[in-house]
Curated annotation (Swiss-Prot):
TM region positions: 220-240, 252-272, 292-312, 328-348, 361-381
Positions annotated to bind heme b 2: 257, 326
Compartments in which it is found: Membrane
Keyword Amino-acid biosynthesis in annotation: no
Names of the cofactor(s): heme b
Domain Cytochrome b561 residues, every copy: 184-381
Residue ranges of every copy of the DOMON domain listed in the record: 49-169
Binding site for heme b 1: 221, 290
Protein name as catalogued: Cytochrome b561 and DOMON domain-containing protein At4g12980
Membrane topology, from the record: Multi-pass membrane protein
Domain of life (superkingdom): Eukaryota
Organism the protein comes from: Arabidopsis thaliana
Length: 394
């Protein structure tokens, strides 16, 4: 009995010792200490990106001292902590960005006055900062730390709160930080910081709701456009191309084609409108290629809809010209639509299964198209052969 108890005790001790290093690597407010520097009475385990903020505030001179800690999204990446004096997002914020020099391994801090996402170059902040430095946190999973003192603007000091933004990214190339992910945690990493620390139980407010709403709108935008430009338009084109070859399908194929394309257009316009709305709400975030293709798609698809009103009769002399125009614009919409769906997927960066599923759907439609193309040509050639072998009437 005693030996059995001893074996159980030793086994428990073994597993406890084995797991203890992993537990110690999980950083939090209570586990972080700083040697040789001042103490920070307030600390927040921020809700996203495994970030931690230690801070103190001297109301007599409106000085905010901070230590921001977070692991970069990839080894060799960067971290950033910022105050936005006017808004709640990254655009317009005054940022401190830390990264390690790849050749020396020394961590340093760069300041960025982020006017827009397309212009991320080192620049002076709109308020004073000093005692700025960066370091790699020992035994903290590759996390970086930013130390700084900030002169809080008078209007923010009077309110007792500042809008803080934090972020992590994959790397630095030629002195420029590489774009961070646009997934949920990266969009939710904003909030309000109580300078006095009197409300530690609610460290962040207003960030998650705004981020979740934006993600929801992006998802709606993506679904609408994938269904319209990326699915219904190709199916509508296939109906017109391959059903009309069967004489019994006339004029049913025409009404099916029009119904499918009109539905695709209506859904596509809704998706285009949500894209414009997202653009207006995301100051400084620009996806020029995706945006320009979207505008082009809306424009030529609208022309295609109006062209149906000017469709000449089959025996009209301009019907041939109209057919060339209609087919050319239609295939342009088809190609641009599929390209822009993939552009959108790369921006949304959803789970890999979504992109795989769309590729599978498009691949299936492509396979069906090849099969129907062969069938169509066989039918056409047989009809021509039958006509050529018919005896001429006397």
């Amino acid at each position: 009995m005693d030996s059995s108890y001893l074996r159980i005790s030793l086994s428990f001790l073994f597993w406890a010792l084995l797991l203890s290093p992993a537990v110690s690597q999980s950083s939090s407010c209570s586990s972080q200490t700083f040697s040789g520097v001042k103490s920070y009475p307030h600390c927040l385990d921020l809700p996203d990106l495994k970030a931690i903020l230690h801070y103190s505030y001297d109301a007599s001179n409106t000085t905010l001292a901070v230590v921001f800690s977070a692991p970069p999204s990839k080894p060799g990446g960067w971290i950033a902590w910022a105050i936005n004096p006017k808004s709640t997002g990254m655009a317009g914020s005054q940022a401190l960005v830390a990264s390690k020099d790849p050749s020396t391994g020394v961590a340093s801090v760069t300041t960025l006055n982020i006017v827009s996402y397309s212009s991320l170059v080192p620049s002076k902040l709109s308020f004073d900062v000093w005692d700025v430095k960066a370091e790699e946190a020992a035994n903290d999973g590759g996390a970086l730390r930013i130390f700084a003192k900030v002169k809080v603007p008078a209007d923010l000091a009077a309110s007792g709160k500042v809008n803080q933004v934090w972020q992590v990214g994959p790397g630095v190339s030629n002195g420029r930080i590489q774009a961070h992910d646009f997934s949920g945690p990266n969009l939710n990493s904003v909030g309000s910081l109580d300078l006095t620390g009197t409300t530690p139980g609610v460290p962040v407010s207003g960030g998650g709701g705004a981020g979740n709403s934006r993600i929801h709108k992006r998802n709606i935008h993506g679904i609408l456009n994938a269904v319209s430009w990326g699915l219904l338009f190709p199916i509508g084109a296939m109906i017109a191309r391959y059903m009309r070859i069967f004489e019994s399908a006339d004029p049913a194929w025409f009404y099916l084609h029009v119904s499918c394309q009109f539905s695709a257009y209506v859904i596509g316009v809704a998706g285009w409108a949500t894209g414009l709305k997202l653009g207006s709400e995301s100051k400084g975030i620009q996806y020029n290629t995706h945006r320009n293709i979207g505008i082009c798609l809306f424009s030529i698809a609208t022309l295609q809809m109006f062209a149906m009103l000017l469709r000449p009769r089959k025996d009209h002399k301009f019907r041939f010209v109209w057919n060339i125009y209609h087919h050319g614009v239609g295939y342009s919409i088809l190609i641009l639509g599929i390209i822009n769906v993939f552009k959108g997927l790369s921006i949304l960066n959803p789970k890999h299964t979504y992109k795989t599923a769309y590729i599978a759907v498009i691949g299936t439609l492509g396979g069906i198209t090849l099969l129907l193309e062969v069938v169509t040509w066989v039918i056409v050639l047989k009809r021509k052969s039958a006509k050529s072998t018919k005896p001429l009437k006397a």
